A protein has these predicted regions:
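Nucleotide donor/acceptor-binding cores
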Residues: 108-110
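Buried hydrophobic packing segments
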Residues: 74, 92-99
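Short beta-strand segments
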Residues: 15-17, 112-116
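Surface-exposed amphipathic alpha-helices with a cationic face
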Residues: 1-8, 100
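A short, small-residue-rich loop immediately preceding and capping a beta-strand
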Residues: 87-89, 115
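Active-site/ligand-binding loops adjacent to catalytic centers
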Residues: 6-87, 104, 126-139
Length: 139
């Protein structure tokens, strides 16, 4: 985000966070609230600490998505788009869709979604029907 905003301050950086992580509330209020910390399963996003590497000054908005929505979106990307991506990618796309629902975009807006990982580490989880059923993600 920093690199892009330094080149074009008009760019909006949208962060994706897991429900149960502290990022969204901290971003919105500046308060680290331990009551926000809840178990979540999506790997690669969210946290129960505020690491020194995250620069909130370059983030414009944070969207939270839950594990089920992220997992189902991950599977949808593979089935419908042919993209064998990881769970955090499903979260990124689900978060982008949620952002679009909550914010008006115009015809000139361009959205770029970073898909940070491959699906190879999730064959036994998100891409496994039995595991998905055990988590209550497949009805």
């Amino acid at each position: 985000g920093k690199y892009l905003k330094e080149r074009n301050p008009e760019i909006k950086v949208i962060g994706i966070d897991s429900v149960g992580s502290v990022y969204k509330k901290y971003f919105e209020t500046g308060i680290f609230d331990k009551n926000e910390i809840k178990p979540y399963m999506t790997e690669g996003i969210g946290e129960d600490i505020i690491p020194g590497t995250i620069e909130f000054d370059y983030i414009d908005y944070i969207v939270q998505v839950d594990d089920k929505v992220s997992a189902l979106e991950t599977r949808s990307l593979a089935k419908d788009e042919g993209l064998f991506v990881g769970w955090s990618c499903g979260a990124a796309v689900a978060g982008a869709k949620k952002y679009i629902e909550e914010n008006r975009l115009n015809d000139n807006d361009v959205m770029v979604i970073v898909l940070p990982d491959s699906g190879t580490r999730y064959i036994g989880k998100v891409y496994n029907d039995e595991w998905m059923k055990e988590q209550g993600f497949l009805d």
